Amino acid sequence: MISISLCMIVKNEEKVIERCLRSVKNLVDEIIIVDTGSTDKTKEIVHRYTNNVYDFKWRDDFSKARNFSFSKATKEYILWLDADDVILKKDREMFISLKKTLDTNIDIVMMKYNTAYDKNGNPTFSYNRERLVKNNNKYKWVSPVHEVIVPTGNILYSNIAISHKSVKKEYSKRNLNIFKKMINNGIKLDARQQYYYARELYYHGMYEDSIKEYRDFLNMDEAWIENKIDACIEISRCFYNINDYKNQIRFLLKSLEYDAPRANICCEVANYFIQKEKYDIAIYWYNAAINLKQDINSGRFENLECYDYIPYLGLCLCYDKIGNYKKAMKYNELLGKIRPDDEKYLYNKAYFDNLKNSIL
């Protein structure tokens, strides 16, 4: 059985830190907490779980803080989490099995990171992260913001999921401010940083600035294809928000220059044609989304709803609009099979029940 150090960086996380530590305490052999300046009860809470609590002066650089936490680890492997992450029961069971059986030739274990959920708690947005790494001084965090460990060596893809359960009500400007500080200090952003900088601008409603930075990103040869495809989606959404619908569809279709269409692209294109009331074309794209398969090892951001929920809902709408009520009801029933308590499904069901009664 391997031994594991949990390494975390925290600041003012009293609302969530105990939930996290409670979920992981029996999975790891050591807990390392690096505090970057808490003024609440965070440190008091973490001391209930570990004495390995270290202060680290915040320097607008997440990688430095995370690398400091890694430097304190003494076990064979390092697990990292954020304070608002939890490991659910079914994933804890898989984690224990992994810990008992992991081949020590494995350098990195990728785990799913679920970051959005439906009202029943089912994940709707997920991607892989380099979650468990060998403690051999080979793996270091890079980038001051949206930090990452570059995956190398022998990599295992696991079905274990880490669940991100944020309680924050507003999207912080912290990351955007770090990027702006880097730029003001003359630091040239690499492709990955350029992508995330443009995305931060989008999240803060700075659509024209975001478009410019995304376009610069698309011209970077070293940029990852999956990020380029996502950039096309975000540019399209920016244009939608400034009422430029011609460029909205233009950049959705530009994504096809990089690879075959992803399910989220298909759904975005279908939605565009719904706006144009071209329902037959929208039907084509929703069906294309349904026929695609998830690639769990791709590393890309996955909106899981684009493989079933969103296309079923869209097809129900489209077929209703063109008067094909039989097919509209069919897709609503498919919707109900995956989400029987969904408000949209129940609303549509009542609508179709009334429609059948009026026809009869």
List where the protein language model places each region:
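Short, well-formed alpha-helical segments that are part of the catalytic scaffolds
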Residues: 7-30
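A conserved acidic beta->alpha catalytic loop
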Residues: 23, 35-45, 58, 82
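Conserved donor nucleotide-binding strand/loop of the catalytic core
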Residues: 44-68, 72
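Catalytic-site signature of metal-activated, phosphate-bearing donor transferases
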Residues: 64-70, 81, 87-216, 222
